[in-house]
Amino acid sequence: MTKKLYIETHGCQMNEYDSSRMVDLLGEHQALEVTEKPEEADVILLNTCSIREKAQDKVFSQLGRWRELKQANPDLVIGVGGCVASQEGAAIRDRAPYVDVVFGPQTLHRLPEMIDAARTTKTAQVDISFPEIEKFDRLPEPRVDGPSAFVSVMEGCSKYCTFCVVPYTRGEEVSRPLADVLLEITQLTDKGVKEVTLLGQNVNGYRGATPDGRIADFAELLHAVAALDGIERIRYTTSHPLEFSDAIIAAHAEIPQLVKYLHLPVQSGSDRILAAMKRNHTALEYKSRIRKLRAAVPDILISSDFIVGFPGETEKDFEQTMKLIEDVGFDFSFSFIYSSRPGTPAADLVDDTPDEVKKQRLAILQHRINQYGFENSRRMVGTVQRILVSDYSKKDPGMLQGRTEQNRIVNFRCDNPRLIGQFVDVHIDDALPHSLRGTLLDASTVN
């Protein structure tokens, strides 16, 4: 009988990438096939996020729901990975003693032997070490699920922003060798992938060894990826303003495959708060980078992350954040109320802003950025957009959907599955709050 794997992923795109590689790994080494139903699974894995307190609470709530499955099937293996696993380690079993395997982002390649050991010894297996970049040497060739794929180019972060747990849960920055990244992308394009998203906690900090002993920076990596056969679009995330260099800006102007969309987190528009966060740049320096980028690529859209209610944030600080939003005109944001994370420097700061004030500020910020995003979408009405068709529409099986280079989901009436994985031109007829609708112009050239 075929053994089944159920995997649930919380958090960032790095976690999504890691989960996909776990599927590849366990498919090759243990012949596990993915199921969408945890009650069918022989192995259940939870890939976790610890960026906010609610995300961490969600982990133990989910584990609690799986406890009955373990009681009904003692041979079921339950594993917890990701940043909560890295942060909590064996302590996870204090609250969920039925967990069999605890592994960190850098040790997921050891899953097959950890699962085997848990089964044979009937004892929990815990490995949350940081063996640098070893995991990539132990992972099989990636499988493909559609025309787009994530590729991790580096791990960890060395910025140590005062609010962030990433350096403690994923380690410091370690870059994959240039040739390794290019090999993985070539393996993907050979299987039909046309768009890659390069991933890292701070991709701008990429410093990968080259075959001739040099160190390639991120701009060089972008040019090298663009030179590969079959690559028609390149995205990347996440970036840090401090290392968003002139060379990267030039790459945006020079590389046609680079999309006209950039996620460049700023977190706050207040220099005082930015200093308290240890972001090591000012709001003016951030705006200067954006101005230079827009001079090179006038129609590029910018998104960001924002933290509202950081300890000590005053009304003036928030007004400065809103001023930055007005000046830049962000298209989208991941924005949240500050969540204190144990072990970070900011956890020791006095948080004296009332919760209601934080909620009000967040609502104001999100409303304004949503306005900018919708304005950008409405400007696309009447234009022709080149989209990469990814799948059928989730809400209407009579429609296909894809994404523009400016990161807009477009739905259009068509039931021809041959278009999935292809680039097509779509006339944009209408802008909705979270997507566009259009009309397919000509699919006669699609084979």
Curated annotation (Swiss-Prot):
GO terms for cellular component: cytosol. Residues 143-375 form the Radical SAM core domain. [4Fe-4S] cluster 1 binds at residues 12, 49, 83. [4Fe-4S] cluster 2 binds at residues 157, 161, 164. Transmembrane segments: none annotated. GO terms for molecular function: 4 iron, 4 sulfur cluster binding; metal ion binding; N6-isopentenyladenosine methylthiotransferase activity. Its cofactor is [4Fe-4S] cluster. Binds 2 [4Fe-4S] clusters. One cluster is coordinated with 3 cysteines and an exchangeable S-adenosyl-L-methionine. Residues 378-442 form the TRAM domain. Its EC number is 2.8.4.3. Its main location: cytoplasm. It catalyses: N(6)-dimethylallyladenosine(37) in tRNA + (sulfur carrier)-SH + AH2 + 2 S-adenosyl-L-methionine = 2-methylsulfanyl-N(6)-dimethylallyladenosine(37) in tRNA + (sulfur carrier)-H + 5'-deoxyadenosine + L-methionine + A + S-adenosyl-L-homocysteine + 2 H(+). Belongs to the methylthiotransferase family. MiaB subfamily. Catalyzes the methylthiolation of N6-(dimethylallyl)adenosine (i(6)A), leading to the formation of 2-methylthio-N6-(dimethylallyl)adenosine (ms(2)i(6)A) at position 37 in tRNAs that read codons beginning with uridine. Monomer. PANTHER family: CDK5 REGULATORY SUBUNIT-ASSOCIATED PROTEIN 1, MITOCHONDRIAL TRNA METHYLTHIOTRANSFERASE CDK5RAP1. This is tRNA-2-methylthio-N(6)-dimethylallyladenosine synthase. The lineage of its organism: Bacteria, Pseudomonadati, Pseudomonadota, Gammaproteobacteria, Pseudomonadales.
